[in-house]
Amino acid sequence: SLFQNCKASGMPVREIFLCDFLSGSTFRAKYKTTVDRYRAAGDEDKNRLKTSLPAVTVSGTFSKRNSAELIAHSGLICIDIDEKDNPDVAEFDRLNELISIIPYVAYCGHSIGGKGYFVIIPIASPEKHKEHFEALRQDFARCGITIDKSGKDVTRLRIYSYDDTAYINPSAATYERTATVRTIYTAA
């Protein structure tokens, strides 16, 4: 589902093919300049610029942006790998080259800030979205990479970005592994 911006929580603007959003010339022509300005901006301007960009729910189509309004899961999960969360990763700017070797990675490109990556992975059991996320978190952690916990949210928005060196694999393998999601309870 395509939403007007990252603050939108109501109805989507329309449905869209993910490939058009990621690499379509229409979005690039309309929003590339804004993304470039965002990447060069100071903190004050970034929030304003970010809310002027469209966003999609990679993991599904929704009548409204909440998990109860999921119409259909896309069979995809999107994870974020941020440089700030991975200070020990040598040559972070070349991480996409390593990620592209992973057979189940369908897409890897720079996030809007240009200092992190978002990775799209086909999953075997959409109804186990969080369990797939947990398994991916564990797999990447074993490689010394921390992924942002926001990927476990099926309603998570992906703000428009572009990457001239994005990795695209339309024949990516499906990620099968799941792991139990641990719930931590706190005393009341």
Which residues are covered by each model-predicted region?
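Short glycine/proline-enriched loop/turn "hinge" motifs that connect secondary-structure elements
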Residues: 67-72, 100, 108-113
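Short beta-strand
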Residues: 107-113, 148-153
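A generic structural motif
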Residues: 115-122
